[in-house]
Structures are given as C-alpha cells and as structure tokens.
A protein has these predicted regions:
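Surface-exposed interfaces of beta-sheet-rich extracellular modules
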Residues: 25, 463-489
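Conserved "repeat-terminator" motif of extracellular CCP/Sushi domains
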Residues: 432-440, 488-512
C-alpha cells in the first residue's frame, strides 16, 4: 500500500504536540521496566537489543537479509513480539516468489523495547515507543528521530552481528497494534501492524514488496513503478515482453489514466498472489548484488501452453479459456499451440537456454510434434535497465491436428551450458516439500538442546528434488556439523528435517565467520 508520506510529513509538527517530549530521549536513556537487563545472553551484549534468528538458511552475505524491528512492544511483551514476527515471516514465505527464494532469504528480529505498549495515532492516543511510529489514517511512519534509531541499529547489526561483509537489505517495522495499518517509506523501511489481515504475513509481504521490489499499488493513480503505466501502447508499455502471458495484459488501475498488468495481484488486492510482472521484479531485486554475493543467475517464469488469444486483454489468473493442459488437449486441434515463458537474466553475463516442446501420443512412443529453439539472453549490464536482459521465449506449432485424449505434452527450458532443466510446462502445478532446519547446541557432555535465539527455518523446495545443506553460522556459536551424512539431501516426502549442531563460541573467537 503506497502511502502518501508527504502528507504525513505535513502533520509531523502536530504529532510533536501530541507525543510527550521525553519520547525523543537518547537510546542510552531508555527506561527498562523493573531494572531488567535487555541483553539476557552474553552473545547478545554486542548489540543494543537481543537479536533473534527467525529464518536463516545460509550466509548473510550470500542471502538477502530482512530485519524485523518491533515498535510498541514493552519488555514484558518481547515473547509476544518474537511470536508475532515469526508468524508474519513464515506466512510471507508461503507467497511466491518469496517461497522459491526461501533458501536465499535470512530474517532476523531485533527486540527493541518500548516504554509503553501500542503506537501513537494522529488525533488520538500518544504512546511512548522506541521508534516513535505513529499512524496517520491507514499509513504508518517514523516521528521524533525513529529513522535515525533504526539506521543506527542496522549499522550495529552489520558491524557486530551479521556474517562478515553482509548488509541489511531492508527493515520491516512490526507495530504492536491491531489496527489495519501498513506502509512502505522507501527501499529501506516498511511497516505493518499485528492486525487480523496480517496474521499470515500478507500485509508484510505486500509492504516489503514495495521496499524490495520497488513495486507500486495497482489501485492508485501513480504510474512511475515497474507494475504501473501511463500508456496502453503494447509496444511501449513497461511489461510489453510479458503481454498475453499468464493473464498479463492491460487493465485500469486507480484512475482512467493509470494502468496495471493484472486484475489479480497482491499489489491490488491483499490475499491474491503476485502477478507475473511483480513476481519477476521482486525476484530480481531479491538477487540484487548490492546485498547478495551469490545471486541466482536467471529467473524463469512458470511456462504455459496456450492457444491464440489477445495479448493486451487481461485474463483471470486461473482462466482455462486459452490455457491448454493434458486434461483439455483436444481443444487445441485446428489451432496454433504455443509453449511460452519469459526470462530475466539477473547477472552480468550472457545466459544460453534451450527450449523444447514435444507432443507424445497416448501410446507413449509416437512423437506427434517436436520443436527446439536456442536463445542467448543478454547480460544484465545495467541494473536499472532490466528490460535489456529480459526475453520472451516461445515455440509455436501451427495448426495442430490429430490430438486425442491421453496425448502428453512435454515442454522444457534447459540451461544449454549445463544441461540443467530450469522449468517445464508442469512447473506451475508442482508440489512443494518443506526442509525444516533445526539449530541445536551440543554440550560438553554430549547432550543437546535447542538454541534459544533461533527459530526452526523452513525452506521450500520442489517435491522429489534435492536440497544442498549450507551449514549457516550463528552469532555467538561455532558450527560443528549436522545430522546428515551427506551434503545434498534427497527430498522425497512432504517434510525433511535436518539438524545443525553448534558449540558456544570460545572467548575471543569472532563470530560469525
């Protein structure tokens, strides 16, 4: 939800009159109720507030780091904050493309302590919180130096806590309020509340998509974002290479002069999946080399097979009107049949892809149609010009005939250099399995216990595939091994559990490494 922070800035002077003057006290003067020390664990003393691992699958320098900071949570409410943060983060990671990149995202929670519970609201209550977040209408934003405090904590994390050389990609401030609030201030800061519509992390997923992906709200009048446009011209519209693919077309946004790619998207309606345009741009930014040292080389949108249809019309996401599968394959008789995807190069080197499309008879041996194409995808030489490294790939079989029930289709996108199959015509419907990563402390007597500062991390991988262990380090601990006798784990069932083992880092040993 893009919020109008210019309007918020206009009323800051009013907010100053509402919020008590002592709210702006320096960090060192923060009152801690009943004299309890914030840093309960020796390993946490290197940071102002304790840091909790919500989700960590790999090195912070290799993964995109998201930090959740709480506002309006008192010392007594820190368990609630951790529960809320974990709940929202886990929910967010069930939405594509966060889901596909769950092995490439690390999430931490900073337990900032507020003197009072809740958040301030313009024209209403005034609450003494650490970041001084206030609500104005449905929007949230910092007041009274909250921005500087959050930036200081970010610098502290980068210098003292995260794996060496890592940077925080974005900060999400979770507010202790049941109000339906949300906002994205810029690429660094976004906000949500502990509201009913955010119980599964939907608001967090939406707001962080603003910050990470630079995406706009598709119900607004603004046209300066990758998923909004001021033109309907199919040659010049920003998503021209995706027109006609998986429901992407041209539809009205918030006004008659603003346009969006889809009627069904998280950036228009909470609870809807991201459209293909938004998924691709969000995936690209999750692999920004300013924050990620080992980016995924290429993004391949889930391929589809379809018969001819309007490229500028906007279809419902799950429309079967033009999409062809093995269930309705006879519908393609006497029509052109297209196997298509759109790819985005995410690194500064050429990618070589091979596209194959076959139709095999119901007998399992007769090949009725077979086509192959090779593509060279230009390097992403300019981060700010992703279109130059984006291509629509397609094989069209003209005027097919003789298709019968039981015929099979086989479409593949293959890395021509390695032979790896990157996607197929079945990718969109693939089942997912969960790899649950547990973090345990191994004591001198050989017994183990859960590491209290780390939640179980759930990584999503395609069913019947493999997962490569990455042996992540944890601040204050030294990694010593896992319960797996191999580095690559077969994922055959719904869930696979892997336990990483650690020892408390010896005094004087710098962690993480």
């Amino acid at each position: 939800m893009k919020k109008q922070f210019q309007a918020l800035l206009l009323i800051i002077s009013i907010l100053f009159s509402i919020i008590p003057q002592d709210v702006a006290r320096a960090d060192a003067d923060l009152v801690q109720p009943r004299g309890t020390t914030v840093a309960q664990n020796e390993t946490m003393q290197k940071t102002t507030f304790p840091v909790h691992v919500i989700h960590k699958a790999g090195d912070d320098k290799e993964n995109f780091v998201i930090v959740i900071m709480g506002d309006g949570y008192t010392l007594e409410e820190q368990d609630k904050f951790l529960q809320d943060a974990a709940e929202k983060a886990r929910g967010m990671l069930t939405w594509s493309p966060y889901k596909e990149y769950s092995d490439r995202i690390n999430i931490y929670a900073v337990q900032a302590v507020s003197n009072e519970s809740g958040i301030s609201e313009y024209g209403g209550k005034s609450v003494d919180t650490y970041f001084h977040v206030a609500a104005y209408g449905k929007a949230l934003g910092f007041t009274s130096g909250g921005t500087d405090k959050a930036k200081a904590l970010r610098a502290e994390l980068e210098e003292r806590y995260l794996d060496a050389g890592a940077n925080v990609g974005t900060i999400h401030v979770l507010c202790n309020s049941e109000g339906s609030f949300g906002a994205s201030q810029n690429s660094l800061f976004s906000f949500s509340a502990n509201s009913e519509d955010n119980q599964n992390g939907t608001v967090m997923a939406h707001e962080i998509a603003h910050s990470i992906g630079g995406l706009g709200d598709e119900y607004e009048r603004y046209t300066n974002k990758p998923n909004t446009s001021d033109t309907t011209n199919p040659e010049t519209i920003k998503w021209a290479k995706m027109l006609g693919f998986r429901g992407i077309g041209v539809t009205q946004a918030g006004t008659e002069t603003a346009f969006a790619p889809s009627r069904e998207c998280m950036m228009r309606w909470l609870g809807q999946p991201f459209c293909e345009v938004c998924k691709m741009e969000l995936a690209r930014n999750l692999n920004n080399t300013d924050y990620v040292s080992r980016p995924v080389a290429i993004y391949v949108a889930d391929p589809e097979i379809s018969i001819p249809h309007s490229k500028t019309g906007t279809l419902d996401r799950d429309s079967e009107k033009y999409r062809i599968s093995e269930k309705n394959i006879t519908k393609a008789n006497n029509r052109d049949l297209e196997f298509r995807t759109v790819v985005q190069n995410m690194v500064n080197r050429e990618q070589h892809l091979k596209m194959t499309f076959r139709i095999i008879g119901a007998d399992g041996t007769t090949v009725k149609y077979s086509e192959e194409k090779k593509y060279t995808i230009p390097a992403l030489a300019n981060w700010y010009d992703p279109e130059a490294a984006k291509e629509s790939l397609s094989i069209t079989i003209p005027d097919v005939s003789g298709l019968v029930s039981g015929d099979k289709m086989e479409g593949k996108i293959v890395d021509a250099d390695t032979g790896e199959v990157l996607a197929t015509d079945k990718t969109a419907e693939q089942a997912w399995s969960m790899v649950n990563l547990h973090y345990k402390l191994k004591k001198e007597d050989g017994t183990t216990e859960d590491i209290p500062e780390a939640e179980t991390t759930t990584v999503y991988v395609p069913a019947n595939s493999t997962y490569t262990l990455r042996n992540p380090q944890l601040a204050g601990y030294s990694y010593i091994g896992s319960d797996s006798d191999r580095n690559v784990v077969n994922v055959a069932g719904e869930n696979v559990d892997v336990t990483y083992y650690y020892q408390v880092a010896a005094e004087g040993v710098e962690t993480p490494k």
